[in-house]
């Protein structure tokens, strides 16, 4: 019987890359269109607008570096936003930039990753790539784009494109602390791999100059990143205070990170963000995290280089969470991103027998179920993304944009405004593109400076506003993010996903002598109601 298989030709060999490109283009296009909908319904919150305000008020990169000295973040994302802010004064431009980065990440996964098409679709539309690191404009997306680009370029063995790899690692180091941790783990993985094979060491010796330049570039990027993340002496936060504030989470709180990252399904409520269905059951999440950890280790236990990457990266993330900063889901999510990177890189390595018989046996027995377990995790991520996107479609992430639009509609945007708490009201200042008075720190500003000046005692906000109105003979608008029952608000904006960005507005008017109109009728003030 003759085989029906077609003979392999150059045309057939080229059809598969073409099909891959078309699939990647279609998947990326769908991602882009759906993400546009997400962004159109996303009101930016303070952590997004803080960077924009810094860039808007900086006349040079040197001034930007000075203003952001309290932020504790490297500057790659800030420099990108600064370049965009030279072209537009609308913060939506930053969202467009972030959308471009998220879309490029989706394309890298869709085109270059070794996963089957179904898994690619689930990865791209998972919680972190579709919502957390796409709809919300922060520096995390840049680090993840560079991580997956590293995976796309990486090849096992000594003949690597070290120059390109180190560029991605350096950009990761300059993105945020979590990307820096993963970049260090990837660099150590390359060293670990080289130590395992004699031919790798010989090849590296022949390219010693190129390798030395790559090492110097990466270490320089790490040094600059750490230098910029170091808080000034007058900062209102430091690593030691973070340690004492968050160490109480204990072992269970730290281990729960794995469950939160791998199964980020939130509570179906309007304040879903950073929540989990098992929230409040920390010990249960810790136990499930240990189970997930053991199973995930078995995924890589027969691929030693990838296992080294996974254990070193995950161990560093857990230590950072336990000893430095407990963080939120957006930080914990890097554990799952690391898992995806290890799954990607693991496709390139042949399996090797593990020396511990019990672990080897468990890995062999798990092998037939790996794809189904991986699909289950990816499906859970998509469910989380769907819940988040549906709620965010109906509920404003922050009330800052609505409050800002209200002030413009009532022609109150140019009034003297007192805002507290500064970190919450800074979102309104960002949307209004103007400075307001922050009692915390006793200064005018749009962004927040996290220095110790803002921690000094202050007088009650409404009393301060009344004194200001009397002294300056000028009406004062007070914006609080916590209702003051002693005063009557002229408007309130409640129900945001970020609960601390609900707002209450109070108008403090100067006392004017009572007058009558020529007709003898009392003058009625203009209504401020909606």
Predicted features by range, described:
Residues 52-56, 60-96, 100:
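Short hydrophobic/aromatic helix or loop-helix immediately within or flanking a transmembrane segment
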Residues 33, 63, 129-133, 148, ...:
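Membrane-interface alpha helices of multi-pass inner-membrane proteins
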Residues 149-164, 194-198:
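Membrane-interface transmembrane helices that cradle and orient dolichyl/undecaprenyl
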Residues 216-218, 290-291, 315, 351-387:
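Signature aromatic-anchored transmembrane alpha helix within multi-pass, membrane-resident enzymes
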Residues 19-48, 216-232, 319:
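Transmembrane signal-anchor helices characteristic of membrane glycosylation enzymes that use polyprenol
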Residues 135-142:
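Short acidic/glycine- and proline-prone juxtamembrane loop motifs at membrane-interface regions
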Residues 96-121, 294-297:
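Transmembrane-helix motifs of polytopic, lipid-linked glycan transferases
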Residues 408, 412, 434-530:
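Luminal/periplasmic acceptor-recognition loop/helix of membrane-associated glycosyltransferases
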């Amino acid at each position: 019987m003759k085989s029906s298989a077609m003979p392999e030709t150059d045309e057939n060999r080229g059809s598969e890359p073409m099909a891959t490109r078309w699939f990647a283009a279609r998947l990326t296009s769908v991602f882009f269109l759906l993400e546009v909908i997400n962004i159109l319904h996303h009101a930016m919150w303070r952590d997004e607008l803080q960077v924009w305000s810094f860039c808007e008020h900086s006349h040079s990169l040197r001034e930007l570096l000075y203003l952001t000295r309290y932020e504790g973040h490297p500057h790659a994302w800030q420099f990108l936003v600064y370049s965009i802010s030279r072209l537009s004064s609308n913060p939506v431009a930053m969202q467009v930039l972030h959308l471009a980065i998220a879309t490029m990440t989706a394309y890298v996964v869709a085109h270059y990753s070794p996963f089957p098409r179904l898994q690619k679709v689930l990865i791209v539309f998972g919680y972190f790539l579709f919502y957390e690191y796409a709809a919300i404009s922060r520096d995390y997306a840049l680090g993840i784009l560079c991580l997956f680009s590293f995976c796309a370029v990486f090849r096992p063995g000594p003949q690597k494109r070290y120059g390109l790899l180190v560029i991605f690692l350096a950009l990761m180091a300059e993105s945020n602390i979590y990307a820096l941790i993963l970049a260090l783990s990837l660099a150590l993985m390359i060293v670990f791999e080289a130590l395992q094979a004699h031919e790798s060491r010989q090849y590296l010796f022949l390219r010693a100059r190129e390798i030395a330049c790559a090492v110097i570039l990466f270490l320089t990027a790490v040094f600059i990143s750490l230098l910029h993340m170091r808080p000034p002496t007058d900062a209102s936060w430091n690593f030691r205070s973070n340690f004492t504030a968050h160490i109480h989470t204990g072992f269970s709180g730290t281990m729960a990170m794995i469950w939160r990252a791998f199964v980020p399904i939130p509570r179906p409520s309007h304040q879903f963000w950073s929540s989990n269905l098992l929230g409040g059951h920390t010990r249960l999440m810790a136990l499930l995290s240990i189970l997930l950890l053991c199973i995930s280790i078995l995924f890589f236990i027969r691929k030693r280089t990838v296992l080294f990457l996974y254990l070193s990266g995950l161990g560093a993330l857990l230590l950072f969470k336990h000893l430095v900063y407990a963080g939120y889901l957006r930080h914990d999510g890097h554990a799952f991103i690391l898992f995806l990177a290890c799954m990607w890189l693991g496709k390139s390595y042949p399996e090797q027998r593990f020396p511990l018989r019990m672990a080897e046996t468990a890995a062999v027995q798990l092998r037939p179920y790996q794809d189904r377990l991986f699909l289950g995790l990816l499906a859970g991520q998509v469910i989380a993304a769907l819940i988040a996107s549906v709620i965010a479609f109906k509920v404003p992430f922050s009330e800052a944009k609505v409050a800002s639009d209200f002030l413009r509609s009532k022609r109150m945007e140019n009034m003297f405004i007192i805002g507290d708490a500064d970190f919450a009201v800074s979102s309104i200042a960002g949307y209004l593109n103007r400075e307001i008075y922050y009692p915390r720190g006793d200064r005018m500003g749009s962004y927040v400076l996290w220095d110790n000046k803002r921690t000094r005692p202050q007088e009650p906000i409404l009393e301060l506003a009344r004194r200001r109105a009397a002294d300056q003979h000028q009406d004062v608008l007070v914006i609080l993010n916590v209702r003051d029952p002693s005063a009557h608000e002229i408007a309130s904006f409640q129900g945001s996903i970020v609960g601390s960005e609900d707002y209450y507005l109070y108008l403090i008017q100067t006392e004017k002598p009572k007058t009558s109109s020529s007709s003898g009728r009392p003058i009625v003030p203009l209504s401020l109601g909606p």
